Amino acid sequence: MTFYRAQALFKFDFLLIWPFKKTSTCHCRPCRKIAGATTSLNLPVQASAFKLQKGKLKNTTNTHVDEGFQFTVAFCRDCGSPIYAEAFIGPNAAAESNTPIIQAGTLDDAGPLEAPPAEELNIKYRLTWVGVVAGANQWQACV
């Protein structure tokens, strides 16, 4: 079992228990705002693989401005760093959402970041100067 940690610059500490899915990048406006960049780099994990060791998270729930579904962002109460998001898509969304989407840039260990993203989401919102990730599945919207 492999663990990945996030704690270096922040007032929180969490562990991710591997294995988990490959990263994806998202081009939608909410993800840009969460990441403070042209895309977000996301790492979906099962809730049981995410272990908050220190700190307290604050949640805020919003309506996705591009697609209309509800999503929650969990962030550090002290430093404001976004840690993960959860999207609620579809008729059974609240009951089925058990997949924190970790903001991959918060990890101390760059191991999960070394491989290119397996998929790109919301490519219809991709900025014109941002290139396609070679070999990544391309999705017009959230999967």
Where are the predicted features?
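A short Gly-Trp-Pro
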Residues: 2-5, 12-143
